[in-house]
């Protein structure tokens, strides 16, 4: 943990977190672990600990527990506390831990304080709940959260949250806001935001299956990305990253054509499959993650069969086995 403690200079702590995150982004993909549940839907702390340890063994650049892939929206405060604390314990400082927070600013602050106490290094602020908001309101939301926590913040634009370049410029001036995760894939808008921000402001590709657009994001100055595939097949995720950064266009194209693009097509069949398919694939690999919680649904038998075939194909491509 590198976040500033009581009495310390928060600016120093933020700089250390930014440095470690930048190093992690340069070294590997960003990992968003699933949250483990028992079959009855209760939180499975032991399964989650084992699963997080497996993710860490696969070498991510940073760990983002209790975020969208981790079903933050379905966790109560005690479950959230356990999820973040276990992630912090398992990483033991090896990589930064960025916990999710969100909803309205008051709820976001409650989760932020829990994450602080649990030892997180930073927070990913997910889109607020339900209502649309003007740009001034989006910036004010981040300002209020930043004023109420010592932890550095990464804004997440997705759904109803989409910052203009001017709003991103304003965010860069908010003490404590260190970066932006983009889930819109509007590359014109993102390019303008990158140009509006100082060099030390972090950006990363947070599309649902980020590898499909990784080359396009890199072209506008955002080479770092989160990988949902790392949550169930780090062999594939790591092989893709190595090929991408090594200029191995043939391998990149083959993985995209035979695995990633078909995965996106399967994902798009049913709302919520961006999480449900990931969790089902992890179960196919023997990971102790359990089912999703409502309102998400587990894949249908036909879609699970298609996922099994696709996962086998992807693993074969990188010399691994189901």
From Swiss-Prot:
UniProtKB keywords: Lyase
Lineage, highest ranks first: Bacteria, Bacillati, Actinomycetota, Actinomycetes, Kitasatosporales
Pathway, per record: Carbohydrate acid metabolism; D-glucarate degradation; 2,5-dioxopentanoate from D-glucarate: step 2/2
GO molecular function: 4-hydroxy-tetrahydrodipicolinate synthase activity; 5-dehydro-4-deoxyglucarate dehydratase activity
Species of provenance: Streptomyces coelicolor (strain ATCC BAA-471 / A3(2) / M145)
Record's catalysed reaction(s): 5-dehydro-4-deoxy-D-glucarate + H(+) = 2,5-dioxopentanoate + CO2 + H2O
Family: Belongs to the DapA family.
Matching InterPro entries: Aldolase_TIM, DapA-like, Dehydro-deoxyglucarate_dehyd
Record EC number: 4.2.1.41
Stated name of the protein: Probable 5-dehydro-4-deoxyglucarate dehydratase 2
GO biological process: D-glucarate catabolic process
Pfam families: DHDPS
